[in-house]
Amino acid sequence: MVRNSEITLEQIFKEGRINLENDDYNCVICSFPLFDGLQCKRGHGACKSCWEKIIGENGKKECHSCRISIKSLDDLSKNLYLEKEIFKQKVACLNNGREKFGNTLVIKSDGGCKRQDIPIEKLLHHIKNECGYLLIDCKYSRDCKYYKQISLEQHQNECQFMSIHCPALCGKKDSRMNINKHLETPNSCKPLISINNSNNSNGNGNGIDDESIIKLSNSIVEIQKSYQNQIKKIKENSESEIAALKDSLYYSKSRIKNLEDEVEELKDRFSTLESMINKLDDSATSRSGTILINGWKMKLKSLDVGHSIVEEQFYIGTNRFYIRIYPFGDSYDNQGYVTVKLGRIDGEEYHLDIGLKVSIKGFDNKKKVLLSYYPGDIAHNIDQLVETWETSKEFKMILHFKVDLKPKIK
């Protein structure tokens, strides 16, 4: 734990009390954080203490990395961005009740501050004003053990070196240690009470002798001691309960933070799933594609009216469709046309929006292309003229199609 309220952030860094996992924030020479880092003209950094050794009487007076000449600290500059980033880093309170021995982290039994997320720039303010676990040197004696800041009142009630007045009202003022001895020594404490012996040689005018007064004083002292012990126990119990409440609050805050992170993660997952569902919805009501046919000449030798050159099957949701291309027409009624037929194999009844675009290259003569939907919802000719394939030229056909399903109104 930190001792002495006059401690500075520079001391904390130089003593190695702060460890930063990112090596970019640590001095490349001493490995301590770059609290007061400086850099050469080429951007190579180190902490001020290491630079002072470099330019010292026995130093090399050159950059440890690029060997550029460094004669004084005036040849160096600060990296303000890096300094700002370092001070943003969050660390645990130094009064966390943990100490490191070698590579072993030991959790001390007296506990400590639970804060784990303090920005370095606010660390000193937290230690001095918020934490309560700062170790304070007793101002009454160097021989007295230091105490935690939150235990100031308890320490003042128990410190053996603190000056107090005798509770028996004798007027004596001394350290608590000496006052206790004073009270335990017979006949050493004489209360400041006027005793009148005019009517009674062994007592005062009211018939109360000196011995009774001393007994009364001692009784008062015992009552005060008992009261102080009760107060001490109440404070100890209260401190224990407060510490437990602080622990519970800390872990509750930590749990809330974890839950908030989980909520954000669930939001991201929901957004992803929503996007996937939208895509599935699109695929369930629409389908588009392209059919490319090369080298018809060889394919057409064995074909006649009613024979298709290609068939493509596809799904829109749970509905299965096909597209067939008949180079000589799908029937003798359509002989002389290239028939492109869209048909539904199975699925529910829908109205269809059909988009077909045909591009045929390599013909000499003209003939029309018939686009039809089976079993007869759509059948029409298009104005596009295509060339016949009775020549020796090779040609290709590109068919772009798009089908949208719409619920059928009954």
From Swiss-Prot:
Q: Which UniProt keywords apply?
A: Coiled coil, Cytoplasm, Metal-binding, Repeat, Zinc, Zinc-finger
Task: Give one GO molecular function term.
Answer: zinc ion binding
Q: Enumerate the residue ranges forming zinc fingers (RING-type).
A: 27-67
User: Where are zinc fingers of the kind TRAF-type found along the chain?
Assistant: 81-154, 154-213
State the InterPro entries in the record.
Answer: Cep57_MT-bd_dom, TRAF-like, Znf_RING/FYVE/PHD
Role, per record: Probable adapter protein and signal transducer that links members of the tumor necrosis factor receptor family to different signaling pathways by association with the receptor cytoplasmic domain and kinases.
Query: In the UniProt entry, what is the domain comment?
Result: The MATH/TRAF domain binds to receptor cytoplasmic domains.
The name on file for this protein is TNF receptor-associated factor family protein DDB_G0279745
Q: Which organism is it from?
A: Dictyostelium discoideum
The top of its lineage is:
Eukaryota, Amoebozoa, Evosea, Eumycetozoa, Dictyostelia
